[in-house]
Amino acid sequence: MKKIALFITASLIAGNTLAAQTYIRNGNIYTHEGQWVAEVGAFGSTDLLKDQDKSYSALLNFGYHGEDLNADLTGINYRFFGNTGDVVNLGTYLTGSGVTYDQDSANSVKGMDKRKATIDLGLNADIALGDGTVSTYFQHDILNENKGYKTGVNYFHVIDLGAVDLVPFAGISYQSSDYNNYYFGVKDKEATAQRKAYHAGGDFSYNLGYKLAYPINDRWEITQTSSYTRLGSDVTNSPIVESANQWLVGATVAYHF
């Protein structure tokens, strides 16, 4: 299965109101502080590339979520300043970033060089505002795949509905020209009669969505996440991009221990 990884701010991470309050740390939604998690699920999304082969995939996650250190298959982050309950927390993190595709991923990229996802090193600041959190970040490619950076701000608001926790979120991000051009640009040697050469500049994207966490018991839970991303014109004007409007819907089952 060819997997297209969308660059969205929201990841499908578990939460459970029976065992712990849902909380935001280092720009992520967590529960079960101090426990391990094993998680499986699936997601479907809008096509990012024109004539894309697949726009769905399985989701697997495993890791440990601690007080300051969190490490799982989505990345590693560490809070180095501040404590739970403080207005400001600062953290650093490593995370996967970008879009992986080759010429077999979509008809629109036939004959183009393979693009690879990368690993970014970033800095994060969480600012607590009651039940809400403003989370800012800056991250840069450390493997020299796209040689670019991303920066942005997200707002999360934790709502306790009794049986479930609801976390609406919204944000804005900026992707540098190096980032956008690597993934969505078309080199002169890749141009065809149907696919013109294209250089993508830096641009903003906007996202909003929600995460719903339903605890079955103290160990098991079900989560459902939906998000919408509006891509900037420097990305959507690319001849290989399908649409500015990107939707993602996913669900997971998680076990905490």
From Swiss-Prot:
- Major subcellular location class: membrane
Which subcellular locations apply to this protein?
Answer: Cell outer membrane
* Pfam families, sorted: MipA
Keyword Signal, does the record have it? yes
Q: Which InterPro entries match?
A: MipA, OmpV
Q: Which UniProt keywords apply?
A: Cell outer membrane, Membrane, Signal
Recorded family membership: Belongs to the MipA/OmpV family.
Which PANTHER family does UniProt cross-reference here?
A: MLTA-INTERACTING PROTEIN-RELATED
Name this protein carries in UniProt:
Outer membrane protein Omp26La
Supply the source organism for this entry. Vibrio anguillarum
